Amino acid sequence: MDDQLNKDVASMREVLDQDLATSQPRMPEQPLLVAMCGLPGTGKSYFAAKLTEQVPFLILETDRLRKVLVEHPKYTTGEHRRVFRSCYQLIQYYLINGYSVLFDATNLNEEFRAYLYDIAEATGARLAVVHATAPQNTVRRRLKERKADRHANTFSDAGWLIYTRLAPVEEPVQRDHYKLDTSKDIAPVLDQVVEWARSSGQIKVD
């Protein structure tokens, strides 16, 4: 790793190691990797929070970790790659050390998701991809409400402008995955992912 990457990983790990004391995301048989993907405002973090209420995971949330590295994020391509590069290193590190990880990020195209596929294969971790979507009018309303609420429980600064900039680059998930429309009741998909996790990833993702 180069010096900048080493520094970034160390800064992020300092934050994440503090989380381990409370989340205790070790699994009885083998670690699991859940990868959220979807545009800003589609409810990824809400789903992740609900999932970890039932199954212990260490959450790597890029919106949170981005601010560990960059005080005022600009969401540029270079910044994006810097954050994700460190996250990939940390995901692999925690999986190798027996922790189950939930990666809460946009993961909009197969180029970025391919890193996660490779990490899961290299570490032997079972992988579940959850693709979150919502109608544009729903997302726009959520982002507007989030911007207006200074006390909103979120690390994300992404607004409608960021959404419209990212939407054209989103690609379909090429592997079996869970399809989550957060404008509807999330309970059925949540139950499926919980069941998958409790089976140590033995249940087929569909």
List each model region and its residues:
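Conserved phosphate-donor/acceptor-positioning beta-strand/loop module used by diverse small-molecule
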Residues: 123-143
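Hydrophobic anchor at the beta1->P-loop junction of P-loop NTPases
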Residues: 36
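Glycine-rich phosphate-binding loop used to anchor ATP phosphates in small-molecule kinases
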Residues: 81-127
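Small-molecule kinase domains that catalyze NTP-dependent phosphoryl transfer to phosphate-bearing small molecules
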Residues: 148-192, 204-206
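Extreme N-terminal, non-catalytic leader segments
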Residues: 1-31
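The conserved Walker
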Residues: 40
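Conserved substrate/cofactor phosphate-moiety recognition/catalytic segment
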Residues: 46-99
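Conserved glycine(s) of the Walker
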Residues: 43
